[in-house]
Design a protein with these regions (language model features):
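A short local loop/turn or secondary-structure capping micro-motif enriched for an aromatic residue
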Residues: 77, 121-123, 155-157
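Sec/Tat-exported extracytoplasmic proteins
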Residues: 43-54, 62-66, 70, 84, ...
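Surface-exposed, charged secondary-structure patches
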Residues: 67, 82-128
Length: 157
């Protein structure tokens, strides 16, 4: 059994609903928004899918070769799906938190979003009080932005 690190606290976020176009498209509704808004919308949709307990949407937003870096470990998308996605969903749904996007940048077909978070609550009998940081790197393939890498880090408050 893997220890749930404080870095998971970054996942427990409060989000507003992000409209997604019908038929499960990865592109949010409002097709004419600037790229930076689209990049942020994909990051928000990822967190909203975690909070909703929606693994298929989480995985659709991750590129097939995506990597997740957390607590000194690196996982490929398939490893994340098989080993930690369910625990991340459980954590996000159990522990309240806030998240704030602190930056977004787009250079051609690559974009990145930085965010910070604060999470407080209890999870599996442990008190959680942490501050987190997130970096998501996305790439645009055609008109679709996909998450290529996520780096989560956190520390106790």
């Amino acid at each position: 059994m893997r220890f749930i690190s404080p870095a998971l606290a970054l996942l427990a976020v409060t989000w507003h609903t992000v409209p997604v176009s019908p038929k499960g498209s990865l592109r949010p509704a409002g097709l004419h928004r600037p790229d930076s808004a689209d990049v942020v919308a994909v990051a928000e949709a990822f967190h909203a899918a975690l909070a909703a307990g929606d693994p298929p949407t989480v995985l659709r937003l991750l590129a097939p070769d995506a990597v997740i870096l957390e607590s000194g470990d690196t996982e490929a998308r398939a490893e994340y799906a098989a080993h930690h996605l369910a625990a991340d969903i459980e954590f996000v749904r159990a522990v309240p938190g806030t998240r704030e996007v602190t930056g977004v940048r787009v250079e051609g077909t690559v974009g990145w979003v930085t965010a910070t978070s604060t999470t407080r609550g209890e999870f599996r009998g442990r008190t959680i009080a942490s501050q987190g940081a997130e970096l998501m790197i996305l790439s645009r393939i055609g008109r679709t932005w996909l998450i290529r890498a996520i780096h989560w880090s956190s520390h106790r408050l």
